[in-house]
Amino acid sequence: MREPMPSPENMEENKMEQYKKEFIEFMVESQVLKFGEFTLKSGRKSPFFMNAGAYVTGSQLKRLGEYYAKAIHDNYGLDFDVLFGPAYKGIPLSVVTAIAIHDLYGVEVRYCSNRKEAKDHGGDAGLLLGSKLKDGDRVVIIEDVTTSGKSIEETFPIIQAQGNVEIKGLMVSLNRMERGKGDKSALEEIQETYGFPANAIVTMEDVITYLYNRPCQGKIQIDDKMKAAIDAYYEE
C-alpha cells in the first residue's frame, strides 16, 4: 500500500531546520510567544503577542544565545568581528550570543551596544558600551523583534559614525511579518533602505506551519479558529 502524500504544511515543516522547531517550542515554553486576544501599543488587536522580556533565567538566556548563534551562523557565517545590540534589550542579546558563538564554534567576537545617554567620564566615556568600533570592523546587529524600522533608523547612524564599519546584516528572533511604511514587510524595507540583509531565527509563517494543530506545552496553540484569526489579522 502506498504511503499517503504529506500535506503542504508537513512538507514545509520537514524542510525546517531542527533548531527552528526547537526555538518555536522554546518561545511558547518560556511564555514569550502567546496566542489569544491582545492589544498592541498601536491600538491594533492581535491574536498573538511576543514579549522577549520574559526570558529571565540563566538557562533561558543560555538557550536563547545558542539559537541566535545558530541562525547567525546559517545566514551570515562567522566571518565578522562585532555583535551590536541596540539598547536596551539588545545589550543582553549581544552578550549571550557572543558567549554562545564561542561555546558552539570556538570563535571570538566582541559585543557592543549604545547608551541612551553618552557617558562623560571614566575610561569608557562616550556613547558606546562594551567594545569600541573601529575602521574595518564587520558588524552583525542583533535585536529581539522588529515590527517597524524605527529601531534601525536610530541604530544605523550610531554605527556609521564610528568610522569605516561594514554592517553584514541584522538578526532578530521573530519576524512578525508586519508591513512597514508601505506594502512590504519591515525587514524587507530595512534591506532596501540600508543595503544589508535582515533575517530572523524564525518567521510567523514558520510558527504557523509548525504549531498548526500540533500539541505544544499540553495544548494545541494554533487550532483552526486561531489560524483563521491570524489569517484575518494579516489580511487587514
PLM region spans:
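A contiguous pocket-lining binding segment that forms or flanks enzyme active sites
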Residues: 128-172
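Short helix-loop-beta connector
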Residues: 76-80, 133-136
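Short glycine-rich phosphate-binding loop at a beta-alpha junction
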Residues: 79-87
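Active-site-facing substrate-recognition patch
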Residues: 14-78
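Short, glycine/charge-rich flexible loops or terminal/linker lids adjacent to PRPP-binding catalytic cores
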Residues: 95-139, 153, 221
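Short, Lys/Arg-enriched N-terminal segments with co-localized hydrophobic residues
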Residues: 1-15
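Gly/Ser/Thr-rich loops at beta-strand to alpha-helix junctions
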Residues: 87-93, 148
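PRPP-dependent phosphoribosyltransferase catalytic core
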Residues: 15-25, 157, 161-236
